[in-house]
From Swiss-Prot:
It is found in: Cytoplasm. One of its GO terms (molecular function) is metal ion binding. PANTHER family: ATP-DEPENDENT PROTEASE SUBUNIT HSLV, METALLOPROTEASE TLDD. This is ATP-dependent protease subunit HslV. InterPro entries: ATP-dep_Prtase_HsIV_su, Ntn_hydrolases_N, Proteasome_sua/b, Proteasome_suB-type. GO terms for cellular component: HslUV protease complex; proteasome core complex.
Length: 182
């Protein structure tokens, strides 16, 4: 696929602070230099509603991975870390899954994780993590705000606003999901 027809998209940020965990994402999907959709929902609740997830990358691939994670959560209820490690093993070793191009941030009341196609399952430092085209901007903004008196949601929203003002593949149509954290 030429660069003109490459799907670009998304910024996802997570913040864990003050007894809350938040994942926020924008709604833009771009094909080359064209915005194809401005209100895509890339942050959602999965499982029994006790896990929140946000994804960046190819949308169909991300949905496949979300479905697989939900199945792992059925196998390992209330064990997000275990379910994520098992998904990462499959993702790395399965011929079909290995070709999927997406990343995910997932969180429950106890843990926040980034899942990558290389089999990495990473926990954030300082309670913040971000992925996607504007991920570095959102991460820098969230880290700068984490020690302020702002709430987790306020930090996530501000980080997304900053990323949207810098990254052309990120818009300000922000979707936020929040859970009480342990």
């Amino acid at each position: 696929m030429s660069d003109n027809l490459t799907m670009h998209g998304t910024t996802i940020v997570t913040v864990r602070k003050g007894g809350k965990v938040v994942i926020a994402g924008d709604g833009q999907v771009s094909l080359g230099q064209t915005v194809m959709k401005g209100n895509a929902r890339k942050v959602r609740r999965i499982g029994k509603g006790n896990v929140i997830a946000g994804f960046a990358g190819a949308t169909a691939d991300a949905f496949t991975l979300l479905e697989r994670l939900e199945k792992k959560l059925e196998q390992y209820p209330d064990q997000l870390m275990r379910a994520s490690v098992e998904l990462a093993k499959d993702w790395r070793t399965d011929r079909y899954l290995r070709r999927l191009e997406a990343m995910m941030l997932v969180a429950d009341k106890n843990v926040t994780l980034a899942l990558t196609g290389t089999g990495d399952v990473l926990e954030p430092e300082e309670g913040v993590m971000a992925i996607g085209s504007g991920g570095n901007y959102a991460l820098a903004a969230a880290r700068a705000l984490i020690d302020t008196d702002k709430s987790a949601e306020e930090i996530a929203r501000k980080a997304m606003e900053i990323a949207a003002s810098i990254c052309v593949y990120t818009n300000s149509n922000i979707i936020v999901e929040t859970l009480d954290a342990g």
